[in-house]
Every structure is written in C-alpha cells, then in structure tokens.
Amino acid sequence: MTAPMSPLLKTLIHRLIASLVVLAGVSMLMFLIARVIPGDPARIALGPNATEAQVQALRHERHLDEPIPVQYWEYIRELAHGNLGNSLYSNRPVRVDIAQYLPATLELVFTAGLMMTLIGIPVGVLSARYRGRWGDHIGRIASIMGVSTPAFVWGVILQLVFAYLWRLFPIEGRLTATLPAPPSMTGFVLIDAALAGDGRALVDALHHLVLPALALAMAGIGQTARLTRASMVETYRKPFIEMANAYGFPESRIANRYAFRPALVPVLTILGLDLAALLGNAFLVESVFGWPGLSRYGVEVILHKDLDAIVGTVLIIATAFLVANIAVDLLVALVNPRIRFAGGRS
C-alpha cells in the first residue's frame, strides 16, 4: 500500500499543472496579438529595398503565408523541443537573445527587490511603531510619493541629482567603457566579477547598478512600507497585543516579535508578486539608463514586429509571475503555520 501524497507535494503538482495551462493560454493570446499588429514582419525585417521575391521567400520560410492556426501549430512543435523560434530583428535564435539579455534584467530586478525589502519593511515597521508622530507622517508621505511617481520619472530625477549635479554615480550602462569586463561565465556581471576575483569590476558594477535599481524599486518600496504599516497597525489592535502591553513588555519586543510576524504574511505576498512584476516594468528604466536587459530588448522586438521574439519574451515574464506565485504561497505557509496547503487540515 502506497503512502498518501503529502499536502505540499499535492499542492505543488496542482500549481504546476495550472501554470502550464496558463502558459499555454498566454502563448496563444500573445501569438494572436503579435500577428494582428499592423505591418508586415518580413518586409520590416528585410527593409524597403528588398524585392518582393525576397519578402515572399522569408514569409514562406517562417510560415507567415500560412493560416494563423497552422502558424501556431508550427510554433508549438518547435516550442516542445525547446526552440523559441528565430528573431527577425537579430537574425539569431530567440533563446540565444534571451540568454544574453535576461541576466542583466535579473540582476537589476533582484537588486531592486532587495531594496524593496530592506527599505520598505523597516520604514513600515517604524511608521506603525511611532504611528501618529512626525516619523510616521514623514514615512507615509515618502511612501505615497514612491507609489505615485512612475519609475522612469524616478530614473530621470536620480540621474539629474546624483549623476549630473553631484556626480556620485554613473549615468548609464553596466560597466565603465574603459574598464575590461570580467570573463562571462554566468552573464551576471556581479557574479562573474566575484568569481574572477576582479574587485575593481565588482565595485564598478555595483556603482552602475544602484541608481537604476533604486528607480525601479521606488514604487515597490512605497507599497511595501504602506502595507507593512497598515498590517502592523491592524495587528496592534488585537487582544494579544493589548495583553502584552498590560504585562509591561518592552515596546521593541512587542513590535518586532508579536506584531511584525502576523503582519508579514500580506507583505510577503505583495513582495513576491511585485518582484515578478518588475520584469515587465523594467523596460522604461532600462531605456533611461541604457541598461542592456530583456525588457529593453522586448521593446525593440515589438517595434520591429519580431513575432517569435515577442512571444518568447512574454513567455519568460509570464513564467516569472507563475514561479513567484508558487514561491510566495510556499513561503507564506512556512511563515504562518495556521495556513495549510490544499489537502491538509484547515
């Protein structure tokens, strides 16, 4: 007799199956949208000087002269073998382009996520702990400014203040042009520099990363701070907090041990989803800072109506959302033992 499947494993299987269905729907929708956008991708790729015969040959090679259902079937057949198609814009396999540009965006997104966590949560905790005082008012105003101002505007402001006026940070790029890049082993400049023992490149890469990551993180910092404050203020009204106050527990212990952990569940949920959303929101920040990442690449392929590259880029971003969703659910269940997975006790 086989042992019953654990609730955790059952939940993971259910989520993975649902994720595959979502990815299939996203691929179908984006495939259709990409093909109804006005413009001939073959003509755009070859340029205005190409002959009609050359354009027709490219259409036939890429199945662009076939009905859309046939085109989608051919795409799914290639996708099943790990082939995302070939880019008309770069004339390379889409997976090669994604492998080149994705590490730069992930480096930016992970750094922004770290800033959201390390800045947003403490600001929210302090605002809740000192609610109604001047520190709380400053934190709330700063949070509203962070949420209400677009990321690209923050990028321009940070460039003007810290790059043009004070000259504390570089304006654009991942590394100084005159500095030799470390050997590319992972595509992540920080990791490559650390593995190569190149301290100068590591410091320079961090120097270039601060402003774009901060611009990308500002809205998330504000949202995280506001949600942390609201969750903790609600927790402060619970009877067990009133009992802790009655017993004379120190304010710091009440805030950090008793009020913070219950308030962490909604914060973790939003943080995980915001981290995945940064992949899609990074395109304007990458354009402002000249950051050679996947989001900037996605804008270029949309402008060139590069069909396979459009679908491939969106699939990567959709996969990031789904992975983040599953990871957040697991993390929340670990933080809050009262939450049970599907199939467990409620």
How would you label these PLM feature ranges?
Residues M1-L8, D65-I121:
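An internal, D/E-rich "acidic patch" concept
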Residues L8, L16, I68-L84, V94, ...:
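Hydrophobic alpha-helical segments of integral membrane proteins
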Residues S19, Y101, T105, I141-S148, ...:
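Residue-level signal for discrete positions within transmembrane alpha-helices
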Residues L20-M30, A104, L108, F321:
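Helix-terminus/capping and membrane-interface signal
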Residues V22-W73, F162-A201:
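Hydrophobic alpha-helical transmembrane segments of membrane transport/permease proteins
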Residues L126-T149, W154, Y164-L165, L227:
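Short loop segments and helix-boundary regions at transmembrane helix junctions
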